[in-house]
């Protein structure tokens, strides 16, 4: 509920409605310096997942943002990755782990399903992953999408754990 309160407080000022061929959503980016507690939460969740499963080198959070997908505009995000790739770029830090916290109850919306694609296999959310407060982590290079919201609104908080470029 605290995260929803932060979103509500910020939503009146710092929102960006993103409409493109790839996505339709309202995003609110958190100022890292003003919301250290939220960054710390995302980092601790990413660290636990990393220690339990991934074993990547991570040491920071890129930033966090709220995403609101609304039935009014069939809010969605098409297949994409959160990681720019293994190519040489000017960036020293790379996104390595994506962290999604579900902030809506599953009864508040229809559609809006987070799907992950592994090779030719698409993994859909399990019902317990739809509950408000549930956390989903995955490597930032895994292709994923949010299907169109057909009824209601879906709110989530997303953050990315980063580390030095891949070797």
Task: State where each predicted segment sits.
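Fe(II)/2-oxoglutarate oxygenase catalytic core
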Residues: 1-135, 141-167
């Amino acid at each position: 509920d605290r995260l929803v309160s932060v979103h509500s407080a910020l939503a009146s000022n710092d929102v960006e409605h993103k409409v493109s061929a790839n996505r339709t959503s309202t995003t609110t980016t958190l100022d890292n310096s003003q919301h250290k507690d939220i960054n710390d939460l995302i980092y601790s969740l990413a660290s636990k997942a990393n220690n339990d499963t991934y074993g990547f080198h991570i040491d920071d959070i890129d930033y966090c943002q709220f995403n609101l997908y609304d039935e009014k505009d069939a809010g969605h995000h098409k297949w994409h990755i959160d990681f720019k790739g293994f190519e040489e770029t000017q960036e020293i830090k790379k996104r390595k782990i994506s962290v999604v916290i579900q902030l809506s109850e599953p009864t508040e919306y229809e559609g809006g399903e987070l799907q992950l694609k592994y090779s030719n296999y698409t993994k859909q959310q399990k019902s317990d992953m739809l509950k408000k407060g549930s956390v989903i982590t995955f490597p930032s290079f895994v292709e994923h999408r949010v299907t169109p919201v057909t009824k209601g609104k879906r709110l989530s908080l997303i953050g990315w754990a980063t580390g030095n470029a891949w070797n």
